[in-house]
């Protein structure tokens, strides 16, 4: 019997960020919108900047298997996350990597690797809002 059009396919999606996670949420939602009757169960882990914070997220991922999307600049945390996901059989996607690699190649400039770099509140920011 065919699946009813109003029944959704539910799946867990885990988003791990060393900043607010806003970028991950937007990318994930834009991607999910391309699939009919797909309903993500969203798990956001924001401001993950220590091994202990990552460990807590990984415990949750193990309890609720699903797709893992991340934006982490810390190489050690990235490696730990990728290794853990591989051992659990979970797909892990570094969302910004292809974009940053392309821009770096085109511009001939290295990626700075600063967590939350787009949301820096500096003197220029405060001058603009005055």
PLM features: residue spans?
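N-terminal accessory targeting/assembly segments
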Residues: 1-31
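Short helix-loop-beta junction
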Residues: 30-39
């Amino acid at each position: 019997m065919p699946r009813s059009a109003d029944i959704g396919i539910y799946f867990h999606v885990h988003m791990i960020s060393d900043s607010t996670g806003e970028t991950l949420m937007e990318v994930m939602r834009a991607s999910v919108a391309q699939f009919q009757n797909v309903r993500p169960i969203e798990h956001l882990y924001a401001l993950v900047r220590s091994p202990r914070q990552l460990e807590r997220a990984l415990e949750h991922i193990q309890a609720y298997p699903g797709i893992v999307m991340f934006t982490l600049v810390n190489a050690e945390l990235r490696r730990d996350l990728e290794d853990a996901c591989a051992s659990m059989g979970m797909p892990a996607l570094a969302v910004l990597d292809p974009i940053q690699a392309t821009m770096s190649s085109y511009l001939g400039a290295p990626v700075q690797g600063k967590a939350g770099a787009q949301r820096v509140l500096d003197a220029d920011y405060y001058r603009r809002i005055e």
